[in-house]
């Protein structure tokens, strides 16, 4: 029997081995170390076949090794045309030595993986192999064409409204009720269809994306992201800082039509503002940081986890902010959609702003619309209306308004903007660079509330009532201004369309940019740190970290404030007013006087309810004030704790109040060198700022009523004999203050406000007071700076007229003939003798 040759036998063996491998079901995408070594042998045979078809196939792939067809092109050779040519020559040679040919795997039978192992596409914490459908594809939007990031912004105002404010007759037919609508796709009246469609598609692309992955990409892609909140409570504070600067500080430093500031820190008027739907309070923290105790804020927001967090105001004195939650006051719910809350909030503000209203109102309302982001505008329509409505209720004529909005595609939203456009002198839709470009957030900024807006306010009030009535039905208010009116005002309509489309384009590019940053984690914005520095410098905000205020004991803080001043002056007792010392009052115009109710002491505020008192002597300790009140940190006052009374008999009520005699530091501001009259004026301003009329449980703070010595008779007119509960039924001398509360006086403080050698006199020819220098014989009408008596001079040279037993102050009292104490008549006679004839209506402050 003839034996087969080796060449005939070997192919059949190889075929059997290959068949065996396939029967075992081996994974052909990988090879074992042994297989690799075996396939790399130089004696490896090619798998060519004698058939023509096999030969044709063989010619289409590269062959490596001594046993392969050497005439075939080497597609891994350097410079050859192949998608493997991207690899360097070393890699190609290594693969060639292992016998690799394009289109075939490694291994003896080419059973190895044929494709290159792809780089990992794992994204964040996604599950292995997870692919988000619809997100991996390209958006085909050129986001790289966005303008270069800059700290400078421009304001584009609506054209000035030339039509009259609509009246009640015209408004009566404007509200339209229709079927409730929960889609936004067809709202193309104020935006091109293709832009709206692209925007919604871009938003929808993120529906399946994990929130954390989205946030990381957003953080890397936004050139302004590093601005964050700086040292404030949150990012909202920096948005307000951004907007305030861009609009020339019209909120924190309002100006008149000539560009002059309406308010000055040295004057008595406060800057009143309201913060609505704005918990935890970032907007207010910024305003109070900028203005300190020269501003007073009122706030209303929904109670709950997003309430005002005043304890977290690290940068500003939260004691100057008073939350009020509508009906029920501090016990209300703060729901801005309830008409009762709107009315109560309005009344509260008018009662505490001399019935004028606030200088400006901020509103930053919003709520979670997770899963329904595309119709956020529709879901928040009533919130937007109510914020506008509260603004028209509480802002004074000439005041300003700022409110957050979202998309403004629906005629309902645009109608609300139109009503503001009619009610304010100028209106602007503005997106600050601190607002992330990928969201639909914008702010409507309104300057100068006009007179005669009552009909619009009442109309919106009725619209809100209707919305509440339709809340659980399939009906809704679809229009507040007819479409023909919105279309008819061409300037308004063109601005509205231009603003919407511009915001759409910015948002689409920003979303596409985030999409790209999600897909490529190596992308980042390189100028974030530089942009942050530029913006903070431009806005006047220090580049500092947020740090909680340090706690300091009262004694240490006191010495930090007064620094090198002699502490002995705080222990000086007033000079008793007697027949001998009465001659000190010869220059009557130099003195002011106040009714005393108890022993004076110094009061130091360390923030919130941390308040301490001290008697003034070096051997005394600072003790915690046992009263319920709040003061900003770094506040040092000269005060009395007085038991005030209201009513008489059994219904008489007593409350302990803080009466301010003089001020040294107000929230860190040193006022000791100011004129006494100026210090008292600033004290009254400060007390109005920290007052909490909504908190009857707190002990009040009041400033003593100050009288000129020549007007001392006005004090006696406010003295009366009253029944005091603790006096055993006897009548006691009582002094009634401005708020109809009375207390038992113990004497009169007389304070010298002019430094020697200066004194005040009266010119009969000019019929006005003037200042006279006894050394230089110089006289002038303007107040000489060197004549101002600072705090320590006033405190050291003050006199005290005691109203004790035997002193006749009231006509019903009896004078002790053996007493050497001064009576009312004796003091009045002295003052009248040294008081030049002067019109009683003359009321100079100094």
UniProtKB/Swiss-Prot annotation:
Domain G-patch: 87-133
Binding annotation for S-adenosyl-L-methionine: 234, 277-283, 335-336
Class in the EC hierarchy, top level: transferase
Location of the WW domain: 752-786
SMART domains associated with the record: G_patch, WW
Domain of life: Eukaryota
UniProt xrefs under SUPFAM superfamilies: DNA ligase/mRNA capping enzyme, catalytic domain (SSF56091), S-adenosyl-L-methionine-dependent methyltransferases (SSF53335), WW domain (SSF51045)
GO biological process: 7-methylguanosine mRNA capping; methylation; mRNA processing
The name this protein goes by in its record: Cap-specific mRNA (nucleoside-2'-O-)-methyltransferase 1
Organism this protein belongs to: Xenopus laevis (African clawed frog)
Taxonomy of the source species: Eukaryota, Metazoa, Chordata, Craniata, Vertebrata
